[in-house]
Amino acid sequence: MKKILVFFIFFQFFISLSQILFADIKINSKLSGCIHKLTKKDNLNFYNSKINKIEIDTHNYKDWTVNNIRIITNNSRFTPNHLKKRFDADIKVIYEDGNICYLKGRVRHSGDAKDHIALKGNSIIQSLDVTLSLGNIRGITRFKLFKPDVRGVLEDVVIQNHILRNFGYLAPRSIKVKARVNETQSIMLFQEKAAKELLEFNSRREGPILEADQKFFFELVKNIPDNNLSNWSVGTPILRTKSSKVMLSKLTNANLIYKGDIHEKISLDAINKLNSIFLYWSSRFQDEKNNFYFFDYDLDNSLLALFDKNKIIKLDIYNLFMQSTNSHHALGGSNRKFYWNSIENYFEPIAYDANPDISRNFSTTTTLKARYPFSIFYDEAIKKLNEELSNINTRKLKNDLSFLGIIMPEEAVKEKINKIKVNLDFINQNYNKVKNQDLALHNQYKYKENILEHFNKNLKEVDPKALLIKRNNSDLFKCEIYLKNCELFDISESDLIKLLEGELVIKNTNYQYVGQNLDLNALSQKGNYYSKKFLNSTIFYEKGIVLEADQIKNEIIINQKEVGARVYILNGNLIDTAIFFNGVETFANIEPQNYPIDIKGLTGCLSLINLEIENLKISATNSNCEDAVNVINSRGSIKKIFIGNSYSDGLDVDFSDLKIDEIEILNSVNDCADFSYGNYKLMNLKLNNCGDKGASLGETSTVEINNINVNDAKIGIATKDSSILNLKNAILINTDTCLAAYKKKQEFNGGFIEGKKVVCKNSFTKIKKDIYSKIIF
């Protein structure tokens, strides 16, 4: 009590003094937006603008400081949630090119452990969670500003995440920045949060993001005093190992369910699967042969990959890379984050809280030299990771790092990569010593019945009053532990979101969502798609599709027999292939099944995904999906696309790099052609009778159009959200607006159009743009 009183007396004086001393450097709260007008270069360098400094001034400075004092003086060694209140703030970003942006947002303290906050001289330095309400920073609106010492070696965090992204994994953009938070100047780690922006930057569609639900994780340690004793001395690892046995998963973006019934179904399916995987994990790390701490034992990659060999190897490589950078902390069950990739049917890891220290010979966040379980493909994964590390272009990596605030000579970059390889070799040696021992064989995946039994037994000890929510088709039931005394549970949509995000508490009682049919065998069920190999690609198709795939003719004919039935082609190469989709005619006022998406998250009647393509020909008629044709994450060239009579959009291309010689689209109820998140060279387009836009270009796309003819559309060509259009020849007839450029989403700039020859006939408006955009002739 005396300690708290001294702090409050000191800070009453400090608050008054600080308000005087940093009054001259405070951000003018009346300013908003950026001082530079949009240029083509701004959109070209949208994700790579160098940041000189980030400044944050909280409103209600006195209340903010008092809250921080309460965090510091709180008797627990962990920060309680009620002290993580949000405060309005002004944010200023100073870029190297001289641009200055004034943003608005809300900030709160971030971090569970007390190492996230400390006194620094006469001020406080702490980790922050920031949500922007106005503007973005390099396309990011939700981010963390970490104290420089809480995520491992700061430069290693930046290096690790950048390499992971180049290897095709999900990792947050991480930047070393100079920062000022109120009166405190410091170097900090800027890191985007796991959110929609992270997914789309990494060429993934928005979908469920999940993590470990820690509601019970701190239950047994929350009252341990904040003293000078170590966590080991007070028994924290032992207590948290016990509480981790009742740790399931939760959604971090449960608001997805607001988008519709199918989005809700996808989200519930994801959490159901991951709960089964967590239950298996928690029943395995301490069993008849195992006696591991929770942070030393990994989730089973066979389950996370839903038993797909290639995905298991990919996940093994991720685990090995984390271990090779001494980032074992990221592999502990309580620190795992995942994206449910509904198209490829597996849980993709999202790098989080890794604490890397590449130069060390051994990690400080594990007690073991070999982590169980090993998959049967572990040797193959080690070999592939070695190859990928050897193929890193260290000069390019050095240049990339400079945009992320890390200035490092190439020789030092090489040393980092070589040390990762040395660490990997050490891991391989330890693995070879134990891989044929009984313990390694014991920890290979084996089916386990009644995986809830272990959970119920431990929950009875950790939180005996907790209530479990199980699902039976569309109904929810509220049950006591062991799923006893269940009764129908009527819940509002807002409370359902709290439940799925692990935050539903009613009358001081924790509610835990467990799901439906928690049986590990359900993870291997194939779903409603059939599959057929075509050359080195795979065609997936639903019951309502009749498929003719002729590899000799290099031709795929798809006849749709049921409205809304879909087909998608995944991975591999399509060279000189012709694809014909013949849909079932439907009435415009009847909504098809699985609209606008299906359980895979697909919007196209025909979708082409993760393909290398050359001289492809596509014809699609009478589609009855959100998109007639959807091309995702594909590279190469298309000779011709013809689309006729689409229920909604005609062509939708996302996350791709394509040259298309000819596009002809007739009669789309919504847009004729959409292009987003990619680079597109379009030679000739003929778009007729488009219900909304002829061509829509968005989300950081760079598009070159040689010739385009649009007849009958609300907007001829729309360019938005940090996209660039180089338009050579256009004839736009019978439109409300010929050309439009605008900003639609907060995380982007406006659109930029550079036109040479544009003919605009029978249109109300030739040009329409907002203050964020530019059109030049």
Where in the sequence are the language-model features?
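Positively charged n-region of N-terminal signal peptides that target proteins for export
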Residues: 1-4
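Phosphate/dinucleotide-binding and metal-coordinating scaffold of catalytic cores
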Residues: 12, 16-517
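Extracellular beta-rich repeat passengers
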Residues: 504-777
